[in-house]
Swiss-Prot record:
Keywords per UniProt: ATP-binding, Chaperone, Nucleotide-binding, Phosphoprotein, Stress response
InterPro entries reported for this sequence: ATPase_NBD, Chaperone_DnaK, Heat_shock_70_CS, HSP70_C_sf, HSP70_peptide-bd_sf, Hsp_70_fam
Name of the protein described by the UniProt record: Chaperone protein DnaK
Gene3D superfamilies in UniProt: 1.20.1270.10, 3.30.420.40, Actin, Chain A, domain 4 (3.90.640.10), Substrate Binding Domain Of DNAk, Chain A, domain 1 (2.60.34.10)
Organism: Helicobacter pylori (strain P12)
Family: Belongs to the heat shock protein 70 family.
HAMAP family, per database record: DnaK
Induction: By stress conditions e.g. heat shock.
Alphabetical list of PROSITE patterns matching this protein: HSP70_1 (PS00297), HSP70_2 (PS00329), HSP70_3 (PS01036)
Pfam families, sorted: HSP70 (PF00012)
Region (Disordered): 597-620
Modified residues (Phosphothreonine): T197
Length: 620
């Protein structure tokens, strides 16, 4: 078993860490940064960019630059959140087997495939850092992710060529990093406000045990939403001044997004910032510029309800844990959005305690995941992690009621059974609709899947005994089975959630990813050959211009023709590596005569060497 990396697959940024030498270490990417933007871009030349390189070209390529893909991970296309995402994101969201997917240049990609490209970049960078192959990982998800979102995350890891040993909740991971060396028992609250999700978890740590007491949150609340409030404000102000709706222009919207995010960050340390976007759009009267001052007070008023929503979640989670505010020993702040001063102020005022900001909010989740990797590998001894299911699980029963089998807050892994019966006389089959949520009626909860148990022996209603068993593994992924206790017939479903991917589709995506990896390597070789050719052509042209007079006309023309041929090859986007190398070789051969001429000129210009036997001295 090689090294297991811990990955925080974030909405905005991702990070990775490894446990080695009895400590968890953050792994820097190839650019030397500890975090990698969770952005994937498709260029017109067919290249796929991931991370910083994708982020840099987002303004000029908004419709093919994919960010915040985590927000539609495992989401059904007909859900309200999908419609909301569709309005906010510049790329095209489409329906694929009922689930959300995206369309780029006529090709449909699932969120798993896009996330896999981010994971592949992290995997490759980790391999470069560690100097060995990486095949196993622990990946974190928001605590409030439902079953389909967790399954989709695991599928993304599989497509990226990773064996995902465990899916772990982000706040739990942060607590693991924070509380591993705590010997005394204490109750801590992790407030995790990231780029796209919010979680709050109350845990008990001590004696190397990390136990989740309660968790809650919102899988669709994060820094992106704070940015969107600023975007809406700027767009509204601009429209009232010019009559132009700039949100309809995808390139302008991307510029607005970047400006809003930068303004939010600047207002964490400044009381006022200026947003200056020249030539944001144009009308019949000419170009338009967006220039607007934004104060911290205005930003706080725009986002006040979002902050208050997080406070109400804190209140309910502490209540679910059976505690009072006074019993919370520490509040650990996690996620980049916790840098917002008002967020810190509101949490501190509610809990009435100083906040623990000793952990790096961008890195601590990945660090915790690497520790869990160390536990699974056996490098970390005597650490027990007790996580819980964030939502209740059950089935639909007579009258459209949700009957719970596993309650919210149950420690996982868990296995529970309940016996049900038929609703009609001589009913030959029962349909098991698996649900997740806290509402009383089935229709108000999330449907995870459905299966039928056939072949029930004829009997009056209420007589057959159908045992339904829910089995949640340590990743929080669910298997449901039903057995007729009279006939012994059984049926089960491993909930694949709303991801809509079959095993064969996942396998195909894994192969596609591998093929793409080889294709990317080939493209890189062509780019390197083109760069080398361009450099040689430039240097040779410069030398030829300087030393042309030292060459005879035929040699000079031969070299110039070779330079021109190589430049034409460099400009040809369809030129192969072999063609570039051949033309480069021809120029190098032709340029040898130029090198000889330059050497001859240098020799001729050097002063005549003095006789070594003659001694310079003054003579009286």
């Amino acid at each position: 078993m090689g090294k297991v990396i811990g990955i925080d697959l974030g909405t905005t940024n991702s990070a990775m860490a490894v446990y080695e030498g009895n400590e968890a270490k953050i792994i820097a990417n190839k650019e030397g940064k500890n975090t990698t933007p969770s952005i994937v871009a498709f260029t017109d030349k067919g290249e796929i960019l991931v991370g910083e390189s994708a982020k840099r070209q987002a303004v000029t390529n908004p419709e093919k630059t994919i960010y915040s893909i985590k927000r539609i991970m495992g989401l059904m296309f007909n859900e309200d959140k999908a419609k909301e995402a569709e309005k906010r994101l510049p790329y095209k969201i489409v329906d694929r087997n009922g689930a959300c997917a995206i369309e780029i240049s006529g090709k449909v990609y699932t969120p798993q495939e896009i996330s896999a490209k981010i994971l592949m970049k992290l995997k490759e960078d980790a391999e470069s850092y560690l100097g060995e192959s990486v095949t196993e990982a622990v990946i974190t998800v928001p605590a409030y992710f439902n079953d389909s979102q967790r399954k989709a995350t695991k599928e993304a890891g599989t497509i990226a060529g990773l064996n995902v040993l465990r899916i772990i909740n982000e706040p739990t991971s942060a607590a693991l990093a924070y509380g591993l060396d705590k010997k005394e028992s204490e109750k801590i609250m992790v407030y995790d406000l990231g780029g796209g999700t919010f979680d709050v978890t109350v845990l008990e740590t001590g004696d190397n045990v990390v136990e989740v007491l309660a968790t809650g949150g919102d899988a669709f609340l994060g820094g992106d939403d704070f940015d969107n409030r600023v975007i809406d404000f700027l767009a509204s102000e601009f429209k009232s001044e010019t009559g132009i709706e700039i949100k309809n222009d995808v390139m302008a919207l991307q510029r607005l997004k970047e400006a809003a995010e930068n303004a939010k960050k600047e207002l964490s340390s400044a009381m006022e910032t200026e947003i200056n976007l020249p030539f944001i759009t144009a009308d019949a009267t000419g170009p338009k510029h967006l220039v607007k001052k934004l104060t911290r007070a205005k930003f706080e008023s725009l986002t006040e309800d979002l902050m208050e929503e997080t406070i109400s979640k804190i209140e309910s989670v502490i209540k679910d844990a059976g505690l009072t505010k006074n019993e919370i020993s520490e509040v650990v702040m996690v996620g980049g959005s916790t840098r917002i001063p008002k967020v810190q102020e509101r949490v501190k005022a509610f809990i009435n305690k100083e906040l623990n900001k000793s952990v790096n909010p961008d890195e601590v989740v990945a660090v915790g995941a690497s520790i869990q990797g160390g536990v699974l590998k056996g490098d970390v001894k005597d650490v027990l992690l007790l996580d819980v299911t964030p939502l209740s699980l059950g089935i639909e029963t007579l009258g459209g009621v949700m009957t719970k089998v596993i309650d919210r807050g149950t420690t996982i892994p868990a296995k529970k059974s309940q016996v049900f019966s038929t609703a009609e006389d001589n009913q030959p089959a029962v349909s098991i609709m698996v649900l997740q949520g806290e509402r009383e009626l089935a229709r108000d909860n999330k449907s995870l899947g459905k299966f039928d148990l056939q072949g029930i022996a004829p009997a009056p209603r209420g007589v057959p005994q159908i045992e339904v068993t829910f089995d949640i593994d340590a990743n929080g992924i669910l298997t449901v089975s039903a057995q007729d206790k009279n006939t012994g017939k059984s049926q089960e479903i491993k909930i694949s959630g709303s991801s809509g991917l079959s095993d064969s589709e996942i396998e195909k995506m894994v192969k596609d990813a591998e093929l793409h990896k080889e294709e990317d390597a080939r493209k890189k070789e062509v780019i390197e050959a083109r760069n080398h050719a361009d450099s040689l052509a430039h240097q040779t042209q410069k030398s030829l211009d300087e030393h042309k007079t030292n060459l005879n006309e035929n040699d000079a023309n031969e070299i110039q023709n070779a330079i021109n041929a190589l430049k034409d090859c460099v400009k040809n986007d369809n030129a192969t590596k072999a063609e570039l190398e051949d033309k480069t070789k021809l120029l190098a051969q032709a340029a040898q005569k130029l090198g000889e001429a330059m050497a001859n000129k240098n020799n001729a210009e050097q002063p005549k060497k003095k006789d070594d036997d003659v001694i310079d001295a003054e003579v009286e």
